[in-house]
Regions:
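N-proximal low-complexity "stem/linker" segments adjacent to membrane-targeting elements
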Residues: 1-23
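Short aromatic/hydrophobic "clamp" motif used to bind/position activated sugar donors
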Residues: 85
Length: 197
């Protein structure tokens, strides 16, 4: 299987970042994980420095000024050592075979997104499934997640493009990455993919 670089910006999100990291390491292929620490003060950098993982890369903005998620995604994608990149948030958890399911749909010139499963904190939408696997880290259980998320998998295409998204690094760089106009807003993905299509 081709390796993916999971690009994960994070700011003071250590407990969720650890969960995201573990979920990626639980996949059958050891992918590259690139964590972009954006001036965190919660021990994130210390935790990263203690990891003995040759496929964990870190970029540390010591602050005090933040770069923001848009700038950090762009920096991480530039740093990625694989041909395929995955925009992954620090509070996301990969389900079993997440990588295999994404890669079977990926080809040059396309963007593939994974359907998000979220607790009912935000409004429902066609790009996600509302189901509560725990709002806090200590409420989350990997065994329950892996068992129950299998029943949620469908082989269908949903409308919209949102994180987690995957594409070839070359395709991302060909359109110049994110537009700084949207930094650090939540519409950066929509703009990026409108320019890509």
């Amino acid at each position: 299987m081709e390796k993916i670089t999971f690009v994960i910006p994070s700011r003071n999100n250590l407990e969720f970042l650890q969960l995201a990291y573990q979920s990626i390491r639980n996949l059958s292929t050891k992918h590259e994980i690139l964590v972009l620490n954006d001036a965190s003060t919660d021990g994130t950098q210390e935790w990263i420095d203690k990891q003995n993982d040759e496929d964990l890369i870190a970029h540390h903005n010591p602050g005090p000024e933040r770069i923001g998620i848009v700038g950090m995604f762009d920096k991480g994608i530039e740093m990625a050592r694989t041909d395929i990149i995955m925009a992954f948030h620090a509070d996301m958890v990969a389900c079993k075979d997440f990588d295999k399911n994404i890669l079977k749909h990926l080809k040059q010139g396309t963007v593939v997104t994974g359907t998000r499963v979220e607790p009912p904190l935000h409004p429902d939408g066609p790009e996600k499934i509302l189901k509560n696997f725990g709002i806090e880290v200590d409420e989350f259980n990997f065994n329950t997640w892996y068992k129950d998320s299998e029943a949620l998998k469908e082989d269908k295409t949903t409308e919209g493009i949102f994180a987690p998204w995957c594409m070839y690094k070359e395709d991302f760089l060909s359109i110049g990455g994110h537009d700084e106009l949207f930094a650090p807003q939540s519409k950066e993905d929509s703009d990026l993919f409108n320019r890509f299509s």
